């Protein structure tokens, strides 16, 4: 079978960095190819070349039997190449339908936008993407997961022969993920060539037919997914066997550091109570929309609770803003790190040291050497992949930007750190590094709240787990009694067979 599109001998360099070196990739009609690699391996650069955002320094692109170039993103789109990115650009002030058909809206015989047709077509595309909401509503009124479905519908609006999905399930619920799997099967049946980029091996082995592995900008291997194991892919990705992805150290849990009592919000959550102890990793699990992130944002002063009390080291604490939380020793690493954490246009080292300038200044003057030393300490412990610390953080891959944000808040030397989806979008090698660092911090006496939607991560790293459902605590479990079934039942409100009650 001939590839729908093939890249041959592609190379691309940026100042100080060789992003791709003589790589090749072939995508076949009716087949899903998984592109696998650590953050910084070159996956994002290749996707940008495929979609006309970057131009290769060397190599060729073949569309069917014809050699071609994509000088612009529009040229790639017109050639039938479309992409669903982790951070697909959408516009909050436009309607869902307008976002879907931006740049190629249906028009009537007078050349004006046919709004009735546009909304009808948008509704049909949303249905194909597994969404059932009104296409006329403003995008700003949707949550993260639904915005992601709009991005999928937008990609489907172009009659593409090649569909690129870059971490498409990152913000989706379990139900939406299964609907996406069904959509991919329909794309295959329609003869589309699908490039699937994911760090979740269960997804890769469920839906991919072929694989291609990148490491440090080079292609390491390719073939049929049926011919490899997860361990094989890991070894190709990192050049070594990754020991334990969840290196949880056994530590002596101390006295309560943070106590939360009767915390509630008019619309997001109610009656949240718990204690967080010194050296403990407390996991918060739940499905999308359970209220975990909303509660954490209220806890650190982004939103105001309607009732409740917080004590830190036994002292009542009133937090009116994130700045007050940071001064008290509570920091929050958000889920949307690209939008809420990293400052694009600023160097890596300044991103890391920005909240910690009191540690790197003397008599009101910044000391550059101390800034670099502080940034180097925390970025190296998280295995950041960057050419230099004065590099613009915007040039890093998404996973490495996440590491910069985590390093930034750890550098403040807090008492409590809240990590919201700490390894979302991070490759398996980097996950192990982040988990090892979390375990080390807990062993040193730092108290950690970890919000995660990944059951293996929750079970592998937590000393205790609180499950939330619909803004309430639905279950509490010690590490010794954790099972995947208990977590899922509590999160979904599934009745236990033993007593007929919801978990």
Curated annotation (Swiss-Prot):
<dbReference type="GO" id="GO:0015611">
    <property type="term" value="F:ABC-type D-ribose transporter activity"/>
</dbReference>
<keyword id="KW-0677">Repeat</keyword>
<keyword id="KW-0997">Cell inner membrane</keyword>
<keyword id="KW-0472">Membrane</keyword>
<keyword id="KW-0762">Sugar transport</keyword>
<dbReference type="InterPro" id="IPR027417">
    <property type="entry name" value="P-loop_NTPase"/>
</dbReference>
<dbReference type="GO" id="GO:0005886">
    <property type="term" value="C:plasma membrane"/>
</dbReference>
<keyword id="KW-0547">Nucleotide-binding</keyword>
<protein>
    <recommendedName>
        <fullName>Ribose import ATP-binding protein RbsA 1</fullName>
        <ecNumber>7.5.2.7</ecNumber>
    </recommendedName>
</protein>
<dbReference type="InterPro" id="IPR017871">
    <property type="entry name" value="ABC_transporter-like_CS"/>
</dbReference>
<dbReference type="InterPro" id="IPR003593">
    <property type="entry name" value="AAA+_ATPase"/>
</dbReference>
<feature type="domain" description="ABC transporter 1">
    <location>
        <begin position="5"/>
        <end position="241"/>
    </location>
</feature>
<feature type="domain" description="ABC transporter 2">
    <location>
        <begin position="253"/>
        <end position="495"/>
    </location>
</feature>
<comment type="subunit">
    <text>The complex is composed of an ATP-binding protein (RbsA), two transmembrane proteins (RbsC) and a solute-binding protein (RbsB).</text>
</comment>
<dbReference type="InterPro" id="IPR003439">
    <property type="entry name" value="ABC_transporter-like_ATP-bd"/>
</dbReference>
<keyword id="KW-1003">Cell membrane</keyword>
<comment type="function">
    <text>Part of the ABC transporter complex RbsABC involved in ribose import. Responsible for energy coupling to the transport system.</text>
</comment>
<keyword id="KW-0813">Transport</keyword>
<keyword id="KW-1278">Translocase</keyword>
<feature type="binding site">
    <location>
        <begin position="37"/>
        <end position="44"/>
    </location>
    <ligand>
        <name>ATP</name>
    </ligand>
</feature>
<dbReference type="GO" id="GO:0016887">
    <property type="term" value="F:ATP hydrolysis activity"/>
</dbReference>
<dbReference type="GO" id="GO:0005524">
    <property type="term" value="F:ATP binding"/>
</dbReference>
<keyword id="KW-0067">ATP-binding</keyword>
<comment type="similarity">
    <text>Belongs to the ABC transporter superfamily. Ribose importer (TC 3.A.1.2.1) family.</text>
</comment>
<dbReference type="InterPro" id="IPR050107">
    <property type="entry name" value="ABC_carbohydrate_import_ATPase"/>
</dbReference>
<dbReference type="Pfam" id="PF00005">
    <property type="entry name" value="ABC_tran"/>
</dbReference>
